[in-house]
């Protein structure tokens, strides 16, 4: 992974309003691989049943997908995302999403993404497909 691309993505995540709102941190970034983390805050992310809102868990998944899919320095956008919600995290759980590229063609790339809590319990798993535009990321 080019250090210029890595630094640009790290800085973009630090500035991103969505990541700031949910306290998402980028822990690791390598070619086609990303690890992000947030603490599930029930005051921000509960649903009507006082459990984690699926959108909050998906937001963490999307952050891992977004960062892993940009590592070649070009814009990639989501084409398809399939999420299985396996378990609901406990309140204030530290959630970690890890995205790994599993396939790549000239125009697409596939990613497996898993969300676990701090005890290693699987919260959600995801398969995502990105469209690779070939255009450079604008914040380089």
Please tell me what each predicted stretch does.
Residues 48-62, 66:
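Compact, glycine-rich, soluble single-domain proteins
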Residues 38-40, 85, 132:
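Hydrophobic residues in beta-strands and at strand termini
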Residues 1-16:
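Extreme N-terminal tail/first-helix region
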Residues 66-96, 101:
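Hydrophobic beta-strand-centered segment that forms part of the acyl-chain substrate-binding groove
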Residues 21-51:
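Catalytic strand-loop segment that frames the active site of acyl-thioester-processing enzymes
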Residues 1-3, 90-96, 100-140:
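HotDog/MaoC-like acyl-thioester-processing domains
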Residues 20-22, 32-34, 75-81, 93-95, ...:
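A generic structural signal for short beta-strands and their flanking turns/coil linkers
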């Amino acid at each position: 992974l080019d250090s210029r691309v890595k630094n640009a993505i790290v800085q973009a995540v630090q500035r991103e309003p969505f990541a700031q709102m949910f306290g998402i941190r980028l822990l690791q970034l390598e070619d086609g691989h990303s690890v992000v983390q947030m603490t599930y805050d029930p005051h921000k992310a509960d649903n009507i049943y006082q459990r984690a809102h699926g959108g909050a868990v998906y937001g963490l998944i999307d952050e891992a997908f977004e960062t892993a899919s940009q590592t070649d320095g070009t814009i990639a956008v989501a084409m398809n995302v399939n999420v299985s919600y396996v378990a609901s995290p406990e309140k204030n759980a530290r959630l970690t999403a890890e995205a790994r590229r599993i396939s790549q063609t000239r125009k697409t790339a596939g990613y497996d993404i898993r969300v676990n809590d701090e005890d290693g319990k699987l919260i959600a798993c995801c398969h995502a497909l990105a469209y690779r535009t070939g255009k450079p990321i604008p914040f380089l």
